[in-house]
Amino acid sequence: MPFGSSAYYSQGMSSTPAPSSATISQLKSSGWISRPIKEEIRLNAVTKIMAKQPLFEGVLGYEDTVMPQLENAILAGHDVIFLGERGQAKTRIIRSLTGLLDEWMPIIAGSEINDDPYNPVSKHARDLVEELGDDAPISWVHRDLRYGEKLATPDTSIADLIGEVDPIKVAEGRYLSDELTLHYGLVPRTNRGIFAINELPDLSERIQVGLLNILEERDVQVRGYKIRLPIDVLLVASANPEDYTNRGRIITPLKDRFGSQIRTHYPLETDTEVQIVRQEARPPSVGNVTVTVPAYMERVVATFSQLARSSSQVNQRSGVSVRLSVSNYEVMAANALRRGLRLGETNVVPRVCDLEAFAASTGGKIEIEALEEGREGQVLRDLIKASVLTVFREVVSPELTRAVLASFEEGAVVHTGEDVGSEDQAMLLGNIPALRPIVDSLIEGDDSAASVAAAVEFVLEGMHLSKRLNKDTSATGGGTYRSRTVTPSANN
């Protein structure tokens, strides 16, 4: 997420075919040069930086904070640990590092650990090169396959990461002393690539000790064997800066061996969060029904998350993920779609009444710290109101609301809610002409009934939250708006 999505992608297999070299001899003739993984990444990063190209696509909000630090770490050849709360695009950035690898890399054919044709380390590769020399066959590995990842869990073992004796190979008649009986773990299998460990504190401390050699001596030692395999990997890890679940910690010697420690953060600006939501959200669509989200409602969604991150009633140790904004955006659009389907409308625009749907998408993503039981719903409603009011004050000029207020003081009464169709709500412009200038400033040229209805409801709710109108709230999330100086009985 900042953010970019998710963060769960690889660069995608290229359509560029692999080079044609099939033996070590042909590889030498092609002029290919073997480089350590960190030098390879550094050179490709330098090329992009000099060409003024971004190192990572789709990551927003880090241009002046995280990215300069990461560029420094890459240029320095450091292993990196990212510290940050959930939903800060740590995994996405890590996975994006594959874009700095050469597109194709040669290995000894059949190698389990991506042996360098010029410097083989496994017994299989050494035997093959010793037997065939420069006629030894090679194969090509795409950069997407040079990335390995492990989500740290308490039950992760040394065998998972480093390797162990394969009992099946022993049962086939091989000796225990034979190196070919080894079953390599994830780290050796990512040799000459990038290996990532997510949620590093969840890895038990004795397993973390096993990573020390990789970071310092750059080799792995397999239990029961005297062999030491020199492994060439860029090791990257992610962790929460303060593990609020108290599941574990990073041991000091391991943390000390990471060359750079980079802190991530949530979007610093509302505009950045809006950009991320537009990039990541997948609003629903059904048949010929279209859902269009206006800019001011996008800002309400983003502002909700921004306010939650500064609220004393929200547990800040657990964080307020950018995924909250994405989920709220999608559920708001879904509620608008459901409303439109029930009313038989094909053009749907989310309204303020659709924000009530946040209850489902917010519940599992923020932790409310309320002294009284059952206060969670009220805290959520207060955040929604504060978000609408904040955006209303940003986008609506107070001078424009005075004429609208005068219409209500003359006795105007307006009903809104899920059961009010867009055409009916848009007709308010005829009854209260003073709404027209404000609505025009919000709809950005989209004068459809759905767009006008959404803008009208947003203006009325903003005026209510600004204490200029009274509102009798209905069960549908809408309500009846009237002047604060006129009682309900006076309008009957």
Task: State where each predicted segment sits.
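C-terminal helical "lid" subdomain and adjoining coupling/linker elements of P-loop NTPases
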Residues: 287-294, 307-383
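Short alpha-helical scaffolding segments that buttress acidic/His motifs in well-ordered protein cores
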Residues: 277, 301-305
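Conserved ASCE/P-loop NTPase catalytic core
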Residues: 14-271, 282-299, 307, 312-317, ...
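Initiator methionine at the very start of the polypeptide chain
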Residues: 1, 13-14
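Short, positively charged and aromatic/hydrophobic N-terminal segments
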Residues: 2-9
